[in-house]
Amino acid sequence: MSKFNLYSDYKPLGDQPKAIKSLVEHYKDGIKEQTLEGVTGSGKTFTMANVIEQLDKPTLVMSHNKTLAAQLYEEFKEFFPDNAVEYFVSYYDYYQPEAYVAQTDTFIDKESAINEEIDRLRHSATQSLLTRDDVIVVSSVSCIYGIGSPEDYAQFTLTLQTQQEISREDILKELVKMQYSRNDIEFIRGQFRVRGDVIEIFPINANYALRIELWGDEIDVIYKIDALKGDIIEELQKVIIFPAKHFVIAKEKQETAIANIKKELKERVDTFKATGKYVEAQRIEQRTNFDMEMLQEIGYCSGIENYSMHMNGRKWGETPYSLLRYFPDDYLTIIDESHVTVPQIRGMYEGDRARKENLIQYGFRLPSAKENRPLRFDEFMRAQNQVLYVSATPAAFELGRSKNKVEQIIRPTGLVDPEPIVRPIKNQVDDLLGEIRKCVDNNQRVLVTSLTKKMAEDLTDYYIKMNVKARYLHSEISTLERTEIIDELRRGDFDCLVGVNLLREGLDLPEVALVAILDADKEGFLRSQTSLIQTIGRAARNVNGRVILYADNITDSVRNAVNITKHRRKIQIAYNNDHNITPRSVVRKLKDKKIEEKVDDIQEIDNITTDEIDEIIKELEKEMKQAAKDLNFEKAAKLRDRIMELKEE
């Protein structure tokens, strides 16, 4: 019987049944890598869920950013309410890694703000992987970064049950070893408090606390309690408590690690002194000795991950521990939006290494800090068992490695791909003006992509002079303002949005009936086959969707993008005719305007006192933290940008 139970009001439709059947059969036949190529809106996530249920194995779902990962996490939680659906992304609301700028002799210390809720979810993910076999972890690229060894992490669990003979002192010692700290006043995750023979523990992965009541050296009763009010939720017979941090090691291993770190330190100091670098020698000696004292005293130090090679007992160049090591041997990895996520995985190692080289060269870190790193791409691929690449535009890498590719071209809504039209570049601006006016007459919106920021601004100015309600969008506009502009387009406050790279906005706007691609024959990143197909897809949410590509030369990218779109459109129209389906535009509610109204209320800064601004900032910070806790990162980003603007005032 399957461990995964998929709940949905829908059954697979269109291309979904065929795609699910093909993928599952090939995986069961031993195929390692496959690709699901599905157009926007074809229900790829539902197909992924069906594959997980039928393969019946733990699954890692990777996405290229936190917001998309949060959306997938929510969808999979709805599909699999009986199973462990977990979320593993970076727990930093804000993160400035330590760095050194040699030109100005400036050391930038690590600065971060940890999101406690995401930290809880990260621990929940690792604990589920070690205790259950019905786990789905939705993750960003964070899953390839170093965390502690799963063996050490599992070794430090504390199992408590009623009638167990154990003294109060022994329980407290174990909790301290597991990096829990005592705090009898403030009670938060990763802490415990003691009142006589009653110990209350707030597990790192929980929204509740545990109350252990002892009778002498025996556990009398265990309760799950409300952490804030202390009310009893239920009585428990047995509990398993996991460490408060992912980096935990036994005392003996720690002593060996410290000895090896000191040995490396001596070699590094000698090297610096031999080359006359006395400042660097003093710096590395002082910093490392301070960390070692902290380790010996409390078993932890700030930046402990930089000593992970020694802590884990790894050799130079050996693959570091990451979330992947917590999965069993037989698991599935689904890489969503693989055309973006795969290159992102590739790039993590080199970027991390370049920053560390500077820190090591100038005596801020030991050379072994380089071994606290994300996985190299070859290490990531070696760690895989079976992989599913998912994208509307899979890249050559995915297609080249996949033994089977399945297509999802039919949308459940019956929507077909927009009609692609190629026109000459001559008079493209005025030709497009006529098309925009037609759309405005039909209460439709228009997206226009230009090659440069200057062109986007000039084009917008020209169209405004021609009485078109137009706005532009590019990378210099803040996150807050970008989101507001997109919402205003949907509401009809203006009709035409001009941008450079509209792909980065994640624009799926049902109101957009025309997408115009200017200078479509200028080969490059934004006019590649993949980018053109992705841009064309921006008009695929409207039943009247069209795309105009302005090009004098039919490049391979233009030809392939147009041919692929026409091919899909032909299949979709034939399917609709055969099944008597009438296409209908996607209907999507506009977002809640409460935040926008709050921002509007405080636009007139000149009329507000400094104290009032401080109060507004406090209120917005509270809302920002709640939004991040709720995994609503778009809302959190808007609030963060507004807070920064207010602080500048």
Swiss-Prot record:
UVR domain sequence ranges: 614-649
Presence of the UniProt keyword DNA damage in the record: yes
Keyword Nucleotide-binding: yes
GO BP annotations, alphabetical order: nucleotide-excision repair; SOS response
Protein location: Cytoplasm
Keywords: ATP-binding, Cytoplasm, DNA damage, DNA excision, DNA repair, Excision nuclease, Helicase, Hydrolase, Nucleotide-binding, SOS response
Bilayer-crossing regions: none
InterPro entries named among the record's database cross-references: Helicase/UvrB_N, Helicase_ATP-bd, Helicase_C-like, P-loop_NTPase, UVR_dom, UVR_dom_sf, UvrB, UvrB_inter
Top-level taxonomic group: Archaea
Broad class of where this protein is predominantly found: cytoplasm
SMART domains: DEXDc, HELICc
PROSITE patterns, A to Z: HELICASE_ATP_BIND_1, HELICASE_CTER, UVR
Boundaries of every Helicase C-terminal domain copy: 428-594
Cellular component terms per the entry's GO annotation: cytoplasm; excinuclease repair complex
Assembly mode: Forms a heterotetramer with UvrA during the search for lesions. Interacts with UvrC in an incision complex.
Function: The UvrABC repair system catalyzes the recognition and processing of DNA lesions. A damage recognition complex composed of 2 UvrA and 2 UvrB subunits scans DNA for abnormalities. Upon binding of the UvrA(2)B(2) complex to a putative damaged site, the DNA wraps around one UvrB monomer. DNA wrap is dependent on ATP binding by UvrB and probably causes local melting of the DNA helix, facilitating insertion of UvrB beta-hairpin between the DNA strands. Then UvrB probes one DNA strand for the presence of a lesion.
Family membership noted in the UniProt record: Belongs to the UvrB family.
Protein name per UniProt: UvrABC system protein B
Protein source organism: Methanosphaera stadtmanae (strain ATCC 43021 / DSM 3091 / JCM 11832 / MCB-3)
Primary gene name: uvrB
